[in-house]
């Protein structure tokens, strides 16, 4: 099953401001989500249940970044909401 990848807000601009190598690594990792966004298939993805029962998915990208995304199974969309350096991701979401 193939999904379409959607970047939330201004993520495209943020990604394009990164160094070339980092940008390639992030784009390659995000592209893999189109084929299989679900955590069961690879260890770099995880389903998180946040406070209030909100579900979000996490993708480790290299050792430097984490992408947070949602999956719309009905529309076959992967909606990337945020890409953060690992340290910021840990501070913001705190427990993983």
Label the predicted regions:
Residues 1-31:
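Arg/Lys-rich, positively charged N-terminal/basic patches that mediate binding to nucleic acids
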Residues 8, 48-52, 68-70:
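Short alpha-helical linear motifs
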Residues 13-16, 61-96:
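Enriched for short, Lys/Arg-rich terminal
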Residues 1, 55, 76-79:
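Residue-level signal for beta-strand positions within conserved beta-sheet cores that form or flank
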Residues 20-23, 35-38, 88:
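Generic structural signal for secondary-structure transition and capping sites
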């Amino acid at each position: 099953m193939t999904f379409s990848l959607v970047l939330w807000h201004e993520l495209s601009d943020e990604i394009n401001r990164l160094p070339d190598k980092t940008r390639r690594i992030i784009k390659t990792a995000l592209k893999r989500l189109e084929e299989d966004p679900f955590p069961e298939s690879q260890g770099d993805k995880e389903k998180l249940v946040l406070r209030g029962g909100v579900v979000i998915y996490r993708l480790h990208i290299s050792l430097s970044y984490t992408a947070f995304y949602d999956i719309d199974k009905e529309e076959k969309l992967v909606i990337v909401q945020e890409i953060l350096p690992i340290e910021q991701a840990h501070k913001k979401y705190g427990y993983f």
